[in-house]
Design a protein with these regions (language model features):
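NAD(P)-dependent Rossmann-like dehydrogenase/reductase catalytic/cofactor-binding core
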Residues: 207-211, 236-246, 250-340
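General beta-strand structural signal in soluble alpha/beta enzymes
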Residues: 112, 138-144, 184-188, 246-247, ...
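Rossmann-like NAD(P)(H) cofactor-binding subdomain of soluble oxidoreductases
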Residues: 64-71, 76-157, 173
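Internal alpha-helical scaffold of NAD(P)-dependent oxidoreductase catalytic cores
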Residues: 92, 103, 128-139, 157-205, ...
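A short helix-to-beta-strand connector/capping loop
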Residues: 54-67, 136-138, 180-182, 307
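NAD(P)+-binding Rossmann beta1-loop-alpha1 motif at the extreme N-terminus of oxidoreductases
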Residues: 1-56, 63-67
C-alpha cells in the first residue's frame, strides 16, 4: 500500500469530493463514484463540484464515474482498487454495503468517513460492516476528527484520526492520507473514534440552538463541556476508551462543530433557536445534517444502557417531541444540583 495506490471514493458530496481531491494530491490514482451523470461529467470537464464545493478547483487527476452503487459502471472501477473510502450518510450505509457485496475485491480496505449511528438498529458503521460484509472487518478503518470539507479541499492545515483495530494497517493508512496540510494519527479504539464523531453532532445542534436564542458564550461552553462528559459516559458503556474522547475525534471535533459556522449541525440549531421549524430547515438544506437522526439513536441507546445524557435527552425532546427551544435550555439549567 506504499507509493501510488488505487483508491475509489464512494459518494460525491462535499466530504467525498474533498477526500478525493486530497488523495489525488497525495499522488494516488483516484476515482470518485457518484450517481449523477451530469455531476460526474462536470467534474471531469471542469474539475469542480458546483453543487457541494462551488468555486473550489479540484485536482485534475480525479476521475468521476457515474452509476448505481455496485452497478456495472462502478463495479468495473471497484474491481481494481486497494482502498474504498465510504463517504455516504450513515443512515444509507447498510444498503450501500449490501450492494457492494460481491463487487469489492476481497483484499480491499474499507475506510468509513460517515459520522452517525444507525437509527433502526442502533449500531455504528463498524457493526454494519461486520453484519453485511464480514470478510472486511479486519480491513476496516474509520476516519474522523475536526475537518470541514471546504477547508480540506482548499488545503488548510487539518489533523484527523484513523481508527483501525489493526495497528499495522492503521500506520499504512496514515501514510496513504498524508499531505503537507493533512496529518493523520491512528488509534485502535474504533468504537471511541466512531462514537465521538457521531455524538458531537447532537451536541452541536444544542450549541447552535443556544447561540440562536442569544444565550451567549458561557452557555455554549457549558453545553460543550457537559456534552463531552455524557459522550464519554456512553462511549465507555459501549466499550470505548475514555481517553479517546479527549483527542481529535472527540474534543477536537466537538469544538469545531459547536463553534464553526460551516457546521451543518450547528446551523440546524441556530435556525431552530431563531424560530424556524425542523421541517423547513431540512427542506432547505442540500447536505445532510447527520445529528438530527443521530439524536434519536443516541437517546434510545442511552435509555437502553441506563446512561445519563441530559443534553441529548433535551435535544430529543426539541426535535421529536415539540419541546420549545427556550424552555428546553432553561430546563437543562434547572436540573437538580450535583457534583461535577
Amino acid at each position: 500500500m506504499s507509493g501510488k495506490t488505487s483508491i475509489a471514493v464512494l459518494g460525491g458530496g462535499s466530504w467525498g469530493t474533498a477526500l478525493a481531491h486530497l488523495l489525488a494530491h497525495a499522488g494516488h490514482s483516484v476515482a470518485l463514484l457518484l450517481r449523477d451523470t451530469a455531476q460526474a461529467a462536470h467534474i471531469n470537464a471542469h474539475h469542480e463540484n458546483p453543487r457541494y464545493l462551488r468555486g473550489v478547483p479540484l485536482h485534475p487527476g480525479i476521475r468521476a464515474v457515474a452509476g448505481d452503487t455496485g452497478g456495472p459502471e462502478q463495479a468495473e472501477v471497484l474491481a481494481g482498487v486497494s482502498i474504498l473510502v465510504l463517504s455516504v450518510p450513515c443512515q444509507a450505509m447498510r444498503g450501500t454495503l449490501r450492494r457492494l457485496a460481491g463487487v469489492v475485491p476481497p483484499d480491499c480496505v474499507l475506510v468509513n468517513t460517515a459520522k452517525g449511528i444507525e437509527v433502526s438498529e442502533l449500531v455504528t458503521v463498524e457493526r454494519m460492516v461486520r453484519e453485511e460484509l464480514p470478510g472486511f472487518v479486519d480491513r476496516y478503518a474509520v476516519l474522523s476528527g475536526p475537518s470541514f470539507a471546504l477547508e480540506v479541499a482548499t488545503c488548510k492545515p487539518t489533523a484527523v484520526v484513523l481508527g483501525c483495530r489493526d495497528e499495522r494497517l492503521g500506520a499504512r493508512l496514515r501514510e496513504v492520507f498524508a499531505t503537507p496540510w493533512f496529518r493523520s494519527y491512528s488509534s485502535t479504539d474504533v468504537p471511541g473514534v466512531e462514537l465521538g464523531g457521531a455524538i458531537k453532532n447532537v451536541i452541536a445542534i444544542a450549541a447552535g440552538l443556544s447561540d440562536g436564542l442569544g444565550f451567549g458564550l458561557n452557555a455554549r461552553a457549558a453545553l460543550v463541556t457537559r456534552g463531552l462528559a455524557e459522550t464519554s459516559r456512553l462511549g465507555v458503556a459501549l466499550g470505548a476508551r475514555a481517553s479517546t474522547f479527549m483527542g481529535l475525534s472527540g474534543l477536537g471535533d466537538l469544538m469545531l462543530t459547536c463553534s464553526g459556522d460551516l457546521s451543518r449541525n450547528r446551523q440546524v440549531g441556530l435556525r431552530l433557536g431563531s424560530g424556524e421549524s425542523l421541517e423547513g430547515i431540512a427542506s432547505s438544506m442540500c447536505m445532510v445534517a447527520e445529528g438530527v437522526k443521530t439524536t434519536q439513536a443516541v437517546h434510545r441507546l442511552a435509555q437502553r444502557l441506563g446512561v445519563d445524557m441530559p443534553v441529548t435527552g433535551t435535544m430529543y425532546s426539541v426535535l421529536y417531541e415539540g419541546f420549545a427551544p427556550r424552555e428546553a435550555v432553561q430546563a437543562l439549567m434547572g436540573r437538580q444540583l450535583k457534583e461535577e
